[in-house]
Amino acid sequence: MAIDRKAFFDAVRGTLYGGRLAGTQVAGLAALLDRFERGEVEDRRFLAYMLATAHHETGGRLQPVRETFAATDAEAIARLDRAFAAGRLPQVSAPYWRRDGEGKSWLGRGLVQITHRRNYARLAGLTGIDLVGRPELAMEMAVSVEILCTGMLSGAFTGRRLADHFSGALTDWVGARRIINGLDRAEKVAGYGRAFFTALGG
């Protein structure tokens, strides 16, 4: 399903990006539009919420990021270690980001951050991409787009799928946050989703 890209970018530039879009943001948005236009699904609410999720999870950058927004794995690990030692990660029982016996770190990476080896393995099985052998692939745009789209369509992240929240007359912008992370920042992400949906001609 073709999207009027000029109308889309004109709309989001004003509503979500303060009147200006960097080239990297345009590239990230375009990569998600390209994936949607392959035709696997046609419900633009799905695309709007995927865009909203990528926007939120990357702090508006629309490029794959590491947990803590660090430039390198080593810096992300150091930041997480400091936060853990200071008691700022009460939800974490074991430091999953520390390198394993093979030197791999299972910290969060991507447009929607997957963490822990088991989750990399689950997404590897669904996408056919070797995320266990090379977890750093989640930092590549094409791979990260596939992880986000496949994960949100299949329910790989939490068991909840886009179809559980957008189907026929059902439109659940707030509850859709459960696809990724409970109801954390659910109202904020819902607002992004509605803005993207309007920009898509919804």
PLM features: residue spans?
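Peptidoglycan-targeting cell-wall enzymes and recognition modules
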Residues: 2-24, 50-152, 170
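An N-terminal domain-cap segment
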Residues: 13-44
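Alpha-helical scaffolds flanking conserved acidic
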Residues: 43-52, 170-177
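Secretory-pathway/luminal and periplasmic proteins that interact with or process carbohydrate-rich
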Residues: 56-67, 157-159, 185-190
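Acidic interhelical loop/turn segments
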Residues: 160-171
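Active-site-adjacent mobile loop/cap segments within catalytic or ligand-binding domains
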Residues: 172-194
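Short secondary-structure subsegments characteristic of cysteine-rich extracellular domains
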Residues: 196-201
